[in-house]
Regions:
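Carbohydrate-binding surfaces of carbohydrate-active enzymes
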Residues: 1-183
Length: 185
């Protein structure tokens, strides 16, 4: 900050810069205990049903998070989950259990996925983390932008299934969303 001020002063033709404000003294926050919580999956808004994956913008949502949910066929062996593409950060859950994360910044698109029974619930929670407004990435849609696939090995050959029939939960980061959450001890 100070170096930038010094550099700018060369071009101010004698004008004086505003004074640097005094530093704000840090405060001490006393320790405290959390007494309640509001689990996200217990506080979801009404779902939108959709055959195909769509971005946040296609659901008229510009920020926050979005949860994609579907049920799976029986997977007798582990498979490979591919999310094309999660913008920006996705957490993957199978029947409520955390499986892993996909981070766009690291180019992550795939996770090893465990075997599961028919009807197991797949949840993909995608968080939008700001907008890119320049260069190649200016088309910066949020959520899942293309598809979700499971690839399983059958008799030595890969078989890929494009998952369909989604329940979609728009989780806008607003006071109205949070004020209606049901808290529990």
């Amino acid at each position: 900050y100070r170096e930038l001020r010094k550099a700018l002063s060369k071009y101010m033709n004698g004008e004086k810069q505003a004074k640097v404000p005094a530093l704000i003294k840090p405060i001490r926050i006393p320790s405290f205990q959390f007494t309640e919580m509001a689990p996200l999956f217990d506080n979801l808004p009404a779902a939108k049903k959709d055959r195909n994956i769509r971005t946040m913008e296609e659901y008229n949502q510009g920020f926050g998070s979005i949860l994609y949910r579907t049920t799976l066929p029986e997977m007798k062996t582990p498979s490979l989950l591919t999310v094309n593409d999660a913008h920006d950060y996705a957490q993957v859950f199978l029947d409520g259990k955390y499986i892993g994360k996909l981070d766009r910044r690291n180019g992550e698109k795939q996770l090893e996925f465990p075997a599961c029974p028919k009807g197991a619930r797949l949840d993909i929670l995608v968080e939008a983390m700001g907008r890119i407004n320049f260069g190649r990435a200016i088309k910066d849609f949020k959520g899942i932008t293309q598809s979700v696939e499971l690839t399983v090995d059958i008799d030595g050959r890969p078989f890929t299934c494009n998952l369909k029939d989604w329940e979609v939960y728009n989780l806008e980061d607003t006071y109205d969303f949070y004020k209606n959450m049901k808290f529990q001890p």
